[in-house]
A protein has these predicted regions:
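Generic structural motif
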Residues: 93-95, 105-107, 151, 167
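Short histidine-centered catalytic/ligand-binding loop motif
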Residues: 104-118
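Flexible, active-site-adjacent loop/turn segments at secondary-structure boundaries
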Residues: 74, 106, 138, 152
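Active-site helix/loop of acyl-thioester processing domains in fatty-acid/polyketide metabolism
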Residues: 93, 97, 115-138
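Short, structured beta-strand/loop micro-motifs enriched in basic residues and often containing a Trp
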Residues: 139-143
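Hydrophobic beta-sheet segments that form the core/acyl-binding groove
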Residues: 146-168
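Non-catalytic linker/capping segments at the edges of enzyme domains
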Residues: 1-101
């Protein structure tokens, strides 16, 4: 799906191709809509460290610096199960910091040649969430304020960092 999403958003296609894609997608959607509905929580509970957190066991992940943090498999930023995932990876930088890295595709453009601001906010939120997961904590964003200092480029490697400033 990700490959198709990127191909459709990044290529000029004739109307006949779009009509063909629409027809095939409707046929597949009708077939898949008849299937069993998926539960994100049930799927997340198949991952031992996620099941532990959702069961109230807040244990830090046993990761070395540079190892990947598995956050949310359905995450728009990095989830392997999300059909439009940006495809970022989250890694441990230290016991109190994490990094999100990747290349953001033109599918996520705001202004020409720039990453949409809401995508930047999403990635910042997800990197902070991955850091909490790594530290064995569960938290939800109550407030997120961003002062954008400049545009983020599309199609180039980007790095987002999160660190613990204070814990209540």
């Amino acid at each position: 799906m990700r490959r198709l999403n990127r191909a459709l958003s990044g290529r000029r296609l004739p109307d006949t191709a779009l009509e063909e894609i629409t027809e095939v997608v409707h046929i597949l959607a009708d077939r898949f809509d008849a299937g069993t509905e998926r539960s994100k929580l049930d799927d997340m509970m198949t991952r031992p460290h996620l099941a532990a957190i959702y069961s109230g066991q807040y244990t830090p992940l046993d990761l070395e610096v540079g190892e990947e943090i598995e956050f949310d498999p359905f995450s728009l930023a990095a989830g392997e199960f999300h059909p439009a995932s940006i495809g970022l990876t989250f890694t441990k930088e230290s016991d109190d910091s994490g990094v999100g890295k990747g290349t953001i595709d033109p599918m996520f453009a705001g202004p020409p040649e720039r990453v949409h601001g809401v995508i930047q906010a999403l990635v910042i939120d997800e990197v902070m969430g991955a850091l909490n997961r790594m530290r064995g904590r569960q938290a939800y964003t109550a407030y997120l304020h961003i002062d954008y200092r400049g545009p983020a480029p599309l199609g180039e490697a980007v790095v987002f960092r999160a660190w613990v400033h204070e814990t209540d």
